[in-house]
Amino acid sequence: LSQHNPTAKIIVADPKPKFSKMALFQEGWNAHYAGMIDWIGSEFGGENVAVDPSAMTISIDGESINVDACNVIPAMKAGRIAALAGVTDGNWAPVNAADMSTKADADVYVLGDASQQGDMPKSGFSANSQAKVCANAVRGALTGSKIFPAKFANTCWSLINADDGVKVGATYKATDEKIAKVDGFISKTGETADI
């Protein structure tokens, strides 16, 4: 976009007060796309957004903005099937960290974004890690084989431009209450792209 339409503006209206790797993204946006990306969090109206497709406008906290394109991502929650199964509490399905079975029904397993599991972020890597723990537990229950203690990991790389990326990751363990973070790492602001 910066090459084909350098006067374009990207506006991110976010209902949350912060997001993962926020300082890293904002540093990268300023370095590579200065003045092009505006992030509007909940404190500044990001949770009060209306969309008018016929007029090609969005309204943020009552202020109307003309747009050429608009990508609306609604508030996230577990799929309807989880609610119909009766395993949700609010937007998510609370699970037991040892095997990803739901707290409402031990014979129903939920993992990934739909689960309310503790400290792990909602990411594909997290879902894959949770799936392995779940598969190990289900296999053990069905075959009587050893069930190994649940261990989880997550790593997320995000490209800010073709030559600049940031990372975050951690390891986790199952506790009686949740999936709990053991240790982690994250890129630091000010790092050069060659690190």
Functional labels for PLM-detected ranges:
Residues 1, 125-133, 163-172:
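Short, electropositive alpha-helical surface patch
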Residues 2-91:
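A Rossmann-like FAD-binding core segment of flavoenzymes
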Residues 4, 63, 101-102, 150:
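Solvent-exposed alpha-helices and their adjacent loops that cap or buttress functional pockets
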Residues 7, 105-106, 152:
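A structure-centric signal for secondary-structure junctions around beta-strands
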Residues 28, 133, 137:
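Alpha-helical scaffold segments in soluble metabolic enzymes
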Residues 47-51, 100, 158:
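A structural signal for short hydrophobic beta-strand segments in well-ordered beta-sheet cores
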Residues 64-129, 140:
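FAD-site-proximal beta/loop scaffold in flavoenzymes
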Residues 138-195:
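C-terminal, flexible cofactor-proximal segment of oxidoreductases
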